[in-house]
């Protein structure tokens, strides 16, 4: 299930340019854009964060992001989607994930954007390591749902 | 015609803290031809005992799709062990 080619879905190692993504999804038939801009917070559980490092299983993560984008089009009356996640070292205040959804009406854009970030956080194989003054930890995460065990024969690849 | 092989070669990937424990991000391994993902993990857990404690808090993928532990592996498969995800 591929996302429409008019969507932008990517993993990047450089700073994300929010303005260009927001402009990209904006069309004359739209009446609203909802944006989720996730960025690096300066603290975690009462500790001062110095910076974060993100890593991904890149081909699978990109495929999962594209699945989410495709699902948005099936589920919500939206126009365009931009979903970009940054990897590598990120400083405080830098955008780690940016999602923009355009639609003719606001409700679909809100619902789709919320679904997109919630699903990304639960299913896309990306990991974040938090660096503090006295060490580093892998952030607590969510275990993605896995199809249940089956005896069905897997088609030969 | 090549001889019938008793083993298969698969690519294994580690991420997050699993990569740190295994000391590598990937390797190719030879397995018995009926091996499943569970037995592949058990093999690594015996080599790196610290891995065992994470068995219940990780998921596996096969060829970039989440896969149950009893997935039987085939030659050329790409298996990854994935800690809880924390993107965003």
Language model: regions and residue ranges:
Chain B
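Ubiquitin-like/PB1-type beta-grasp interaction modules and other compact soluble beta-rich domains
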Residues: 1-87
């Amino acid at each position: 299930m591929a996302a429409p080619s008019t969507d932008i879905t990517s993993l990047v190692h450089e700073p994300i340019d929010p303005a260009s993504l927001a402009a990209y999804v904006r069309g004359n038939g739209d009446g609203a854009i909802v944006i989720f801009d996730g960025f690096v917070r300066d603290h975690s559980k009462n500790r001062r964060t110095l910076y974060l490092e993100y890593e991904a299983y890149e081909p699978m993560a990109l495929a999962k992001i594209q699945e989410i984008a495709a699902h948005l089009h099936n589920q919500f009356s939206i126009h365009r989607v931009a979903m970009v996640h940054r990897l590598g070292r990120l400083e405080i205040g830098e955008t780690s994930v940016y999602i923009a959804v355009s639609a003719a009406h606001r409700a679909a854009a809100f619902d789709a954007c919320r679904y997109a970030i919630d699903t990304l956080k639960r299913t896309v194989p990306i990991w974040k390591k938090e660096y503090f003054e006295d060490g580093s930890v892998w952030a607590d995460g969510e275990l993605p749902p896995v199809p249940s065990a089956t005896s069905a024969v897997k088609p030969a690849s | 015609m090549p001889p019938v092989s008793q083993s298969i070669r698969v690519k294994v990937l580690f991420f997050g803290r699993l990569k740190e424990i295994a000391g590598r991000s990937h390797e190719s391994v030879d397995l018995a031809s009926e091996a499943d993902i569970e037995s592949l993990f058990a093999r690594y857990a015996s080599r790196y005992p610290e891995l065992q404690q994470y068995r219940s808090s990780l998921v596996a993928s096969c060829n970039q799709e989440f896969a149950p532990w009893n997935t039987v592996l085939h030659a050329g498969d790409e298996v990854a062990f994935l800690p809880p995800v924390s993107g965003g």
